[in-house]
Amino acid sequence: MSKIQLITKNPCRNLILNTILSKPTTFMKLVSESQCASETVEKYISIHLQDHKIHQKKGKFRILFSPELKPSEIEFYELILNPTVRAVVLVLLKSNPLSQIELVAITDKSNPSISRALKLLLHKKIILRNYNAPYSTYGIINKSRLFSILEKTNPIIANNFDQFDLCYPKPSIFLTIHN
């Protein structure tokens, strides 16, 4: 058997390429999903990178993606790898502008964590801060654009978005003072 025949018969090679071309992914997630050894995954990633079939971005995570994706889409994917940022984005996509305290209650994340996520999303110009006395509310600037990016970068979330239901806390939580 020639080397070419061996390569084409290897299911890991095609699986890795198809997975990366269908949606961006991290190296470790790719190893987990493909159920191939990490050395094998690394080998085929190197081959696909040399052939310019895929691209990668190294940062906190090693992100592998299709060359068809725009840098802004990869930047958004990298942002939503953070669970708190992802929770805030999904809640704000599904709702009207909310205050920080409402986001804390809905997402069940800590106040400092929500604060960091909001600061990051404001800096990236994904959300807008509305100043309303006595508090501010936050909303997504362009929901349709953000949702189209979500469809390209995280199709599982996008396809199941209608099933995602917000469990709003009772308004009394924000109004009562506990002794």
Which residues make up each language-model segment?
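Long, low-complexity, charged/polar intrinsically disordered regions in eukaryotic proteins
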Residues: 1-3, 28-32, 36-74
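N-terminal accessory/assembly segment that mediates macromolecular interactions
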Residues: 8-13, 22, 26-30
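Short capping segments at the starts of secondary-structure elements
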Residues: 20-26, 95-99
